[in-house]
Each structure stands twice: as structure tokens, then as C-alpha cells.
Amino acid sequence: MITFGEKLRYLRRKNNLTQKQLGMAVGFPEKTADVRIAQYETNARTPREELLRKLAQVLGVQKEILTVPVLTKPTEFSAAFFWMNELSLK
């Protein structure tokens, strides 16, 4: 499964932003902006709801693009399909 940090790094690079630029755009002080974004990209920190909203806005995506799991293995697809089917029967 693709992690939050991997998605964040991909979208940051796609938008041609440095870690410092992204960090400052979401409100981190210039001195620590790059370190904070690096922590999220390496999954050392988990962003709160407000930060997720800001990141999505700056990166030009819906918040769910950052938060919803991305399935990459056949077993993950099978499990997701199973639960979607089970939950739709209720």
C-alpha cells in the first residue's frame, strides 16, 4: 500500500515545490518548514485534519487523495472488494 508520505512527496514534486516551499505554504515557520514536511514524507509524523486540508489545498487535490489508501497488491483489492460487498448488503 502506498503510504501518506509517498503520496505527499509525489504530489509535492509534481507541483515543483521544495519541502521548504510546501511547508511555508501551509504555515510552518521558514526555519523548520523543510524539516516538518520531511517528517510527514517519511511517515515519522501524522498530520492532523487542519494540516491535511491545507496540504490538499496547496497541492490542488481533494483531501481524500492524501488520506484514502491506495491498493497496490491483489490481496488488498480482494479484501477491499469483500468489505465493499459486505457493507453494501446492509
What are these regions (language model features)?
Residues 57, 67-90:
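Short, charged recognition helix plus adjacent turn
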Residues 1-3:
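A detector for short, charged/polar N-terminal pre-domain segments
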Residues 27-46, 68-69:
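Recognition helix of helix-turn-helix/homeodomain-like DNA-binding domains
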Residues 25, 44, 48-65:
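DNA major-groove recognition helix of helix-turn-helix/homeodomain DNA-binding modules
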Residues 8, 19, 34, 49-52:
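Helix-turn-helix DNA-binding elements, focusing on the entry/boundary residues of the two helices
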Residues 6-27, 82:
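Short basic helix-loop element that most often maps to the first helix and adjoining turn
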